[in-house]
From Swiss-Prot:
This is Putative 3-methyladenine DNA glycosylase. InterPro entries: Formyl_transferase-like_C_sf, MPG, MPG_sf. Coiled coil: none annotated. It comes from Mycolicibacterium paratuberculosis (strain ATCC BAA-968 / K-10) (Mycobacterium paratuberculosis). Keywords: DNA damage, DNA repair, Hydrolase.
């Protein structure tokens, strides 16, 4: 399965394109990835990105972003919601793709049990925190190999699909980069919200 991971030995935007349409399976739930965001790395690396957790270098928190590709990088947003990323690029070079939304195909009842009985199906895995909640992804999954069939969370790549791109959600730096990609027409895709701390549109990296 590491042959599949080699498909992610590319820049983060290309990796994001390749992850759209992939099947993500976790703890009784599976779905198609419909929205992602690419993140680069350190200032002197090939893809400097001030919005990335890895921008200031290797830390205990972000080491998974430095490879190898195909590993799950988890973190808590605002100290509450678990978010999931897939490492990409050459081993030792920081880059990852944030999984923002998925269209669930199997285990919808399991996901609804985790998210709430009244949550609309299209919203079960809409947004990074909701995706992890629906899939049962936790901080304990940090660093697992997504292409290992014995992992609690696995990934299966397919042929890339046509994507739409635009600015990333909620970042205050590098806020104009069109590094958010999604599948058009999917109701599971989240709404775009620009960070109130970001410069005016057109004035940021």
């Amino acid at each position: 399965m590491r042959d599949a991971a080699e498909q992610l030995l590319v820049d983060p935007v290309e990796a994001a394109r390749r992850l759209l349409g992939a099947t993500l399976t976790g703890r009784g739930v599976s779905g198609v990835i419909v929205e992602v965001e690419a993140y680069g790395g350190v200032p002197d690396g090939p893809w400097p990105d001030a919005a990335a957790h890895s921008y200031k270098g290797l830390r205990a928190r972000n080491f998974v972003m430095f490879g190898p590709p195909g590993r799950l990088y988890t973190y808590r947003s605002h100290g509450i919601h678990v978010c999931a990323n897939v490492s990409c690029g050459p081993d030792g070079t920081a880059a990852a793709v944030l999984l923002r939304a998925a269209a669930l195909e199997d285990g919808t009842d399991v996901a609804r049990g985790r998210r709430g009985e009244l949550v609309h199906t299209a919203a079960l895995a809409r947004g990074p925190g909701n995706l992890c909640a629906a899939m049962g992804i936790t901080m304990a999954d940090n660093g697992i190999d997504l292409f290992d069939p014995d992992s609690p969370v696995t990934l299966r790549l397919h042929e890339p699909l046509t994507a739409v791109c635009g600015p990333r959600v909620g970042v205050s730096q590098a806020a104009d980069r069109p590094w958010r990609l999604w599948l058009p027409g999917r109701p599971e895709v989240s709404a775009y919200r620009r960070s109130p701390r970001a410069p005016a549109p057109g004035t940021s990296d």
